[in-house]
Structure formats: structure tokens, C-alpha cells
């Protein structure tokens, strides 16, 4: 329970919405094992683990190409690629590896389109904490209204502790949360990772310095 309390501090979401994992990658694979989606929409390029996890459960993978002439940003034509036979849409905000963010209005339109098509939207926000306007960009406030939304978060990026492995996801759908928990080992987060996460949340001055440095060097 302590690890969930830690994630509550980070996300301001109810404890019953939170599932902790051995890093965000652990939760990505759990998601695909739990959902077993037949048709998945990913962006290209994107973090390779999305495609690998989808392939393990036999999903048909379709790609939305991020184009140089669009500064590698998602455009409104993605809405046409989300169809009633789409089971899962996986996006990364900001995208890995391009570093680009989707306009907030378009992101909420994608979320609504997914609901219309009974599709799950998985939003990887693991790099969002680097942004100065992260509070305006996150879709965490939409979780209560959209049970078809899952948000991934991790401590390992901003706090430079990737080897410790600590991540979590948030979802308001109780059944989906139970399926996620059942799709992985029950003791996936070590005591060391829990303690590191608690310590990280007290290091706000460090986090602010990292954000400032990243902004200066972009």
C-alpha cells in the first residue's frame, strides 16, 4: 500500500485507480496481456516496447506515421484511423524519440474518438514531468470521465534511476485494474524501489533544476 500512497502524491489520483509495476515497461506488457487487443494503432516512430508487447499477444499493428513536414507531430487525420474495429491506441506524450507533444485539444479529441469506437487509449506520460507546462498537458483530470483511458507514469526518467525500476499506471475502470494486477507477478516492486520513490518525491528542488536544464539545452 505504501507504494500506491507514493503514487497518489505524484498523480493526485485515488488509490483504487493505481497499479504499480517494475517500471513502466512492466506495465506495458501487463496491459497487452490483460487486454489482448486484436487491432492496435501506434505512432511511427515510437518506443519499441509498444510494438514488441503487441506482437507477443498477436495483435494486428497499424501505424500512424509522424512526418518531418509536420514537425513529427500528430495531426487531425489520426482521428480517421481510429475505427470501430480498433481495440487499442497507444500514444506517448511527449513522444519518444521525437520529443514532440500533441496539441491538447487534439489529444482530447482522440480520447473522445476512442470512446466512440469502444477503444482503449493508453497514454505514456513518462517524460511529461520534464515539461514546464506538464499540469496543463496531462490527461489525468479526464480519468474519472473516461474509463477507456489508461495513463502510464514512471519515476525512472526525471529522477535518473532507470535501474531501480519503478512505474505505475492509473485507470478509473475497476475491472481493467483487476485484470492488470492479475497479469503480472504480485510482488513486482522491490522495497528498494519503493524507498527510492519516496525519497525522489521529496527532491522537488532537484526536479526543478533538471527541468530548467533540459529546457535550456533543447
Where are the model-predicted features located?
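Helix C-cap/helix->beta junction micro-motif
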Residues: 57, 116-117, 146
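PLP-dependent aminotransferase-like
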Residues: 26, 33-91
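PLP-dependent aminotransferase class I/II
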Residues: 148-218
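Conserved beta-loop-alpha segment that forms the PLP phosphate-binding cup at the N-terminus of a helix
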Residues: 15-38, 167
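Hydrophobic residues in well-ordered beta-strands that form the structural core
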Residues: 42, 63, 123, 151-153, ...
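Short, small-residue-biased leader/transition segments that mark boundaries at the very start
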Residues: 3-8
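Active-site phosphate-binding strand-loop segment of PLP-dependent enzymes
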Residues: 69-131
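Short acidic capping loops at alpha-helix termini that bridge into adjacent secondary structure
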Residues: 14-18, 39, 125, 147-148
